[in-house]
């Protein structure tokens, strides 16, 4: 809908255009879970269904000739993807961010920043039993690019103790997907 600016001064018009837009339909959609939980597949489905930009950390790392094991590069990629996500959200385009988000503080920071942009925030937590995670990881490890830097069972076992699963109180802080309303 075009704005009627015929009776407004140039200063008033500029002020109106600079006001933050209400981005009511725009969403930051986060996936959360351990490796092998199905985050990337879910992110693909959500991006297609919602017409959103999907940003998957691991895919960017592999494309840059790195691996998820390269912590300095991973941190740089995460930072840049998060900056890009915020710019895209400001434009009114939904973003699916596929990072894993193992800690509550990461999820809190992203939720708070997105709320500051005036967008809704969803968290899709995938809680998968350890044996199923390992079965999926073994299958993934057999194919490129993961066959060159496979996840070991000892890695998974250690990560389970580091992962901070969202509880019901935290999940209640996020918006429900539109199809759930």
Please identify what each model-predicted range represents.
Residues 34:
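P-loop (Walker A) phosphate-binding loop of NTP-binding proteins
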Residues 72-121:
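Glycine-rich phosphate-binding loop used to anchor ATP phosphates in small-molecule kinases
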Residues 2-6, 20, 28, 45, ...:
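Conserved GTP-binding G-domain of TRAFAC-class P-loop NTPases and closely related GTPase folds
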Residues 117-137:
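Conserved phosphate-donor/acceptor-positioning beta-strand/loop module used by diverse small-molecule
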Residues 9-22:
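Pre-Walker A adenine-sensing motif
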Residues 37-93, 139:
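Conserved substrate/cofactor phosphate-moiety recognition/catalytic segment
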Residues 59-61, 102, 127-133:
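Conserved nucleotide-binding/hydrolysis micro-motifs of P-loop NTPases
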Residues 31:
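Hydrophobic anchor at the beta1->P-loop junction of P-loop NTPases
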């Amino acid at each position: 809908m075009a704005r009627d600016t015929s009776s407004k001064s140039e200063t008033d018009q500029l002020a109106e255009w600079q006001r933050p837009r209400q981005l009511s339909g725009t969403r930051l959609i986060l996936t959360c879970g351990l490796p092998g939980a199905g985050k990337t597949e879910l992110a693909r489905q959500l991006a297609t269904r919602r017409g959103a930009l999907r940003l998957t950390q691991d895919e960017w790392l592999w494309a840059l000739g790195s691996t998820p094991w390269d912590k300095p590069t991973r941190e740089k990629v995460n930072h840049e993807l998060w900056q890009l996500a915020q710019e895209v959200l400001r434009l009114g385009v939904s973003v699916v961010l596929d990072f894993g988000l193992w800690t509550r503080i990461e999820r809190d920071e992203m939720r708070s920043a997105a709320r500051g942009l005036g967008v809704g925030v969803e968290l899709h937590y995938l809680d998968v039993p350890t044996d199923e995670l390992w079965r999926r990881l073994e299958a993934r490890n057999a194919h490129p690019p993961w066959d060159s830097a496979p996840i070991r069972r000892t890695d998974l076992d250690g990560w389970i103790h580091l992962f901070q699963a969202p509880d019901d109180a935290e999940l209640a802080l996020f918006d429900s997907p539109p199809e759930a309303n």
